[in-house]
């Protein structure tokens, strides 16, 4: 059941980014990015990384909401463009949703969802060792995981925030 929840969240995640990439208006783009950020953190938390999901969501809300508030105030339109007001925007959105639907059908046809990454050094995460078995708690090792194994998450998050700022500036420049 948890795999299906993660799969549905990833579908909503991709569709929300398709909605943002069709960029009808900065107001709706900011809203869709906030929703996709929340869904992305839900994906991280559904795989057991509650501390990392919370950290990413706090970083995202702290950084991007300020940027979107400023750019939305600077690019206020009397009649903001929606996804169905332009044929090009609507066709881009429909094409992205159809590609996501084809991916979903392909995944259901094969009947398997594989995890992309594997932890090779699980011994580093063990908190209580009882001979042949070890128990680890995700909350206790969350901070150490963020700064040791999760360094790439911090780098990708920082780079994504930087690219997001550039995209928002590009979207609002033409308005």
Swiss-Prot record:
Give the UniProt subcellular location, in the record's own words: Mitochondrion inner membrane
Which reaction is recorded as catalysed by this protein? a ubiquinone + NADH + 5 H(+)(in) = a ubiquinol + NAD(+) + 4 H(+)(out)
Q: Which GO terms describe its molecular function?
A: NADH dehydrogenase (ubiquinone) activity
CC annotations in GO: mitochondrial inner membrane
Which GO terms fall under biological process for this protein?
Answer: mitochondrial electron transport, NADH to ubiquinone; mitochondrial respiratory chain complex I assembly
Q: Which UniProt keywords apply?
A: Electron transport, Membrane, Mitochondrion, Mitochondrion inner membrane, NAD, Respiratory chain, Translocase, Transmembrane, Transmembrane helix, Transport, Ubiquinone
Q: What class of enzyme is it?
A: translocase
The way this protein sits in the membrane is described as:
Multi-pass membrane protein
Q: Name one Pfam family in it.
A: Oxidored_q3
Please name the InterPro entries in this protein's record. Answer: ComplexI_Subunit6, NADH_UbQ/plastoQ_OxRdtase_su6, Nuo/plastoQ_OxRdtase_6_NuoJ
Q: Which residues cross the membrane?
A: 1-21, 25-45, 47-67, 88-108, 149-169
Q: Among its keywords, does the record have Acetylation?
A: no
EC number(s) of the enzyme?
7.1.1.2
Q: Which family does it belong to?
A: Belongs to the complex I subunit 6 family.
Quaternary structure per UniProt? Core subunit of respiratory chain NADH dehydrogenase (Complex I) which is composed of 45 different subunits.
Purpose: Core subunit of the mitochondrial membrane respiratory chain NADH dehydrogenase (Complex I) which catalyzes electron transfer from NADH through the respiratory chain, using ubiquinone as an electron acceptor. Essential for the catalytic activity and assembly of complex I.
- Protein name in the entry: NADH-ubiquinone oxidoreductase chain 6
Q: Which organism is it from?
A: Rhinoceros unicornis
């Amino acid at each position: 059941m948890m795999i299906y929840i993660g799969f549905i969240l990833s579908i909503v995640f991709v569709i929300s980014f398709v909605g943002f990439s069709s960029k009808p208006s900065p107001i709706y783009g900011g809203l869709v990015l906030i929703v996709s950020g929340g869904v992305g953190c839900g994906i991280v938390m559904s795989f057991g990384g509650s501390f990392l999901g919370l950290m990413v969501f706090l970083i995202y809300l702290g950084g991007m909401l300020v940027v979107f508030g400023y750019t939305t105030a600077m690019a206020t339109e009397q009649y903001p463009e929606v996804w169905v007001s332009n044929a090009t925007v609507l066709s881009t959105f429909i094409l992205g949703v159809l590609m996501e639907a084809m991916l979903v059908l392909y995944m259901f046809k094969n009947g398997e969802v594989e995890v992309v990454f594997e932890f090779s050094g699980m011994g580093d995460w063990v908190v209580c060792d009882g001979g042949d078995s070890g128990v680890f708690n995700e909350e206790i090792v969350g901070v150490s995981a963020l700064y040791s194994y999760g360094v790439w998450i911090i780098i990708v998050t920082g780079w994504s925030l930087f690219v997001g700022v550039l995209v928002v500036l590009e979207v609002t420049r033409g308005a």
